[in-house]
Amino acid sequence: SLDTIKIFTFGILSDCLVFTVLSGFLWLYLIFISNSKYLKPTGYIVFGLLVSLFLYVTFGNTILNEYGGALPEIGMAFIGLKTLLFGLLLFLPKYRSTIRFWLFSFVIFLFVTLILQNGISEFFFWNEFGVKYNFIAVDYLVYTNEVLGNIMQSYPVIPLFSGLFIVAAMVTYFIVKRSKHFIEMIPTFTEKIKISGIYLLLFGLSLLSIP
């Protein structure tokens, strides 16, 4: 019906705005790609700070622990992975270009997967509740075990995710093939400022436009 078309059109527009905002993580990753941060002594200082942060998140009582759920584990895994990858890039300069290429490919794959997964989730969420994402979807992060159990029982998870990963891999291959020059010839500081200006403008407009 016309109402359904309007709802999904509005939903797609809303998703585009949200993804523009969430692309901030991708933007941060891309603008911080450089070789200068691995020079002495900067590289060792940064690595030491990352190790300290990882130990604090792992053994300390952080704000993530107050929220509970899967957030502490997610934070620990993210910082631990960041520390490991920075260490590899720092201590293995001969393999830095190769590691950076595969890391870039993985980040693009992860981003594409999240976008596609969100589309699939919205489809099933609509069929289940008759509405778009709301606070119930946010609660999924807190009640992870219960939600995962319900999903595994209710939907053909393995075929869905198999197809999702195949499509995401194909899209990632196309994107990386067209954009790998970004990591082969790292943009200058001035170029990064220009790119950042454009993104921050889109970020601000999207943030103000999100319903």
Regions from the PLM with identified roles:
Residues 1-211:
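Transmembrane and membrane-interface helices of multi-pass
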